[in-house]
Amino acid sequence: MAEAEAAQLKEEGNRHFQLQDYKAATKSYSQALKLTKDKALLATLYRNRAACGLKMESYAQAASDASRAIDINSADIKALYRRCQALEHLGKLDQAFKDVQRCATLEPRNQNFQETLRRLNTSIQEQLRVQFSTDSRVQTMFEILLNENSEADKREKAANNLIVLGREEAGAERIFQSNGVALLLQLMNTQRPELLLAAVRTLSGMCSGHRARATAILHAVRIDRICSLMALENEEMSLAVCNLLQAIIDSLSGEDKREHRGKEEALVLDTKKDLKQITSHLLDMLVSKKVSGQGRDQALNLLNKNVPRKDLSIHDNSRTIYVVDNGLRKILKVVGQVPDLPSCLPLTDNTRMLASILINKLYDDLRCDPERDHFRKICEEYITSKFDPQDMDKNVNAIQTVSGILQGPFDLGNQLLGMKGVMEMMVALCGSEREADQLVAVEALIHASTKLSRATFIITNGVTLLKQIYKTTKNEKIKIRTLVGLCKLGSAGGSDYGLRQFAEGSTEKLAKQCRKWLCNTAIDTRTRRWAVEGLAYLTLDADVKDDFVQDIPALQAMFELAKARTSDKTILYSVANTLVNCTNSYDVKEVVPELVQLAKFSKQHVPEEHPKDKKDFVDLRVKRLLKAGVISALACMVKADSAILTDQTKELLARVFLALCDNPKDRGTIVAQGGGKALIPLALEGTDVGKVKAAHGLAKIAAVSNPDIAFPGERVYEVVRPLVSLLDTQRDGLQNYEALLGLTNLSGRSDKLRQKIFKEKALPDIENYMFENHDQLRQAATECMCNMVLNKEVQERFLADGNDRLKLVVLLCGEDDHKLQNAAAGALAMLTAAHKKLCLKMTEVTTQWLEILQRLCLHDQLSVQHRGLVIAHNLLSADAELARKLVESELLEILTVVGKQEPDEKRAAVVQTARECLIKCMDYGFIKPVS
């Protein structure tokens, strides 16, 4: 019974294979393998699954399956040749050569085997030449580097060559086999910064994607030494060591995603102990006074990237639990650091923000309430332990910690604000005489007032205090933070015109002061950052945003701040937020008139729209932003380091880009300033909402711009996937429509682009929209298909039996919409020109084909008529019998009438095509010239 089912599954797999559905074929063969013990059938199944692997480019799997078939039958020539092909793609040329040599012995006259033998022989000779030269080059490089008397430029060149070699698989293996790790350790011992850097970068390349090498290097160099190098003040060195550790972590945790061929039961090293040791050392670095600010930042970056789960569907969050139990107090210590206090650890401007992000990611990674309660208790105990009436520094640290948590997991921060004494301590510190205390307290109040209920509490209890500090303090840093606090409280009602917190005109005064500080380059960046943050809140008020976009110096000062290398997460986020407010690209809930009436009747507050939030005002603001150079600022922000550019900021940038692209007339300016290129990374990475918004922006640009200019070089291929994602039926109609327009434009450029669109599986979606009831969607999809049919693989789908693709195109030619007819007739003309079989198939798919063709040839739109005549010419050229059928119909009369017309400038192509059709009929002898 099982054997019969296995044979049936094999046949099913063969059918899937013939239909080019290789995934389904693989599934059928795999199911059959579980059911049979018949050796001959097993060999066939493994051999067939290997063929699927080759087609899907899963070469390691293909080689493994072919090997199993050969284990059963060593003379299985198909399996041998398939393994040879797989091994060649995996770069194992010597093993591939042995397999094809065996094939050639079994079938000496097979030209294919002989040709493969010759090709592999040439490749192996070349590989050997490179390998021997690599061996000698490695030796020479180390000799130059370790020789004290070598010239400086020679040493620099040798170091750079070594780094390049370490990044190549063959080069890395040669270095490793030539006792390279020991020699690299010698280089590190020389204490010369440039040699140390070269050694670290070479090791980083050698660890990438190779677990065994990474493990050996980790044990040889030792984790404590790696961390001590990362702790150095040198930024370049710290970053290089961070990259080395990341490469080791990736390889140990299997994140390199490379296929490793071999037995499935092969021994796998247990790397958990090493990974835990790395995490433990990174946590220790956070609280060590010997570690530089740069080193602390890199340790936080590594923890941020590698501890929380990347996919929440994976249940194992043991790494997060380990860090919470063993390192949360250390992270809280970093968050609670106050730079102005003497006991502060070495920090950079980003350190506390990175620690807040880590706390946020750890909290989000917890799976249940008991885990979250445990996390909260650790935070509560830590903060409570810091409260000390005798030691003001400890109190300041406690409030700074709460402030940091409020910038991370906000819900947790809110719970901590509710602890006894926290809000009271904030207010008490505001009244302190020490400026450091005031600074921390004001910042904490700003972060605490995010929730409307808390903001209302602070408006009731703390505004007077903030105003007093603002008036009395001479310290600009405190003054600007107090101003931001007032800005935040003033914008607590959001964009709701009816919920203004302060008197009319107060927010404009605050904004004016923020703009003044923003333009003052004498103030340090960190302080000017607060001015941007103030504007991010105040620009929810339409009067403020209208004034701001008219203040060109303030706009450009903000853009320069965003472009600067010293910018941090907060600056980028605040700038992005301000631009979202100015362009009104935030989500607005749809107002249901009935609900508004109901709310008024029940005396509930109804949000009011500000008069300056109407579309005309928004369009004017967009124009002013473009004129001020917003695109170049956005392009610089997109290029920021991934540690600084968070997914939330990317989403905001995508919203701004989409709003800027709204008017087709502005898209040329956006492309000219590099907006097209800048949108691509936003469409590929970030939040789901952000990726969709960025993809929509790309679609708007791709629909009307020359792709060669908008997305120069290879970038154009990266645009395809985001556009295809917009074809999902879950997206709204406008996104579907503009994605189709963009794909139409791209598919008209080159066959390579058409191939890319086909490989991204866009064709089923395009076909789906050709059935759509919506006229514009159907037209856009048909136009896209008109370009796509130039691709051979698309033509093969029309040639395949058992589908109605050709029938749909023929029927669309008979629709009343001339634009739709034009696109469908264009596709049909291309298809019938490419394959004679399709000419015959066209006459079989529907009985109305001749009537539709005659309508096309008589169409009053010349472009449609021309395409109809081209189809007629293709049918006449395809087959004599088919030509006879056409001549016997009314089509001959139509061709004669059109052919006799005077070929003026507009009609020349139409008349010429009709005459070519008549000449074809004369060639067959169906008609004769009048003379």
Curated annotation (Swiss-Prot):
Principal location: cytoplasm
Cited SMART domains: ARM, TPR
One GO biological process term: chaperone-mediated protein folding
GO (cellular component) term, any one: perinuclear region of cytoplasm
GO molecular function term, any single one: Hsp90 protein binding
Family matches, as Gene3D superfamilies: Leucine-rich Repeat Variant (1.25.10.10), Tetratricopeptide repeat domain (1.25.40.10)
PROSITE patterns with a match to the protein in the record: TPR (PS50005), TPR_REGION (PS50293)
Coiled coil residues, start to end: none
Listed InterPro entries: ARM-like (IPR011989), ARM-type_fold (IPR016024), Armadillo (IPR000225), TPR-like_helical_dom_sf (IPR011990), TPR_rpt (IPR019734), UCS_central_dom (IPR024660)
Compartments (UniProt record): Cytoplasm, Myofibril, Sarcomere, Z line; Cytoplasm, Myofibril, Sarcomere, A band; Cytoplasm, Perinuclear region; Cytoplasm, Cytosol
Transmembrane regions: none
TPR repeats (start-end): 6-39, 43-76, 77-110
Tissue distribution of the protein: Highly expressed in adult skeletal muscle and heart. Detected at intermediate levels in lung. Highly expressed in embryonic heart.
Keywords, in A-Z order: Chaperone, Cytoplasm, Developmental protein, Differentiation, Myogenesis, Repeat, TPR repeat
Physiological role: Acts as a co-chaperone for HSP90 and is required for proper folding of the myosin motor domain. Plays a role in sarcomere formation during muscle cell development. Is necessary for normal early lens development.
Subunit structure, interactors included: Interacts with HSP90 in an ATP-independent manner. Interacts with UBE4B; the interaction may target UNC45B for proteasomal degradation.
Protein name: Protein unc-45 homolog B
Organismal lineage: Eukaryota, Metazoa, Chordata, Craniata, Vertebrata
Gene: Unc45b
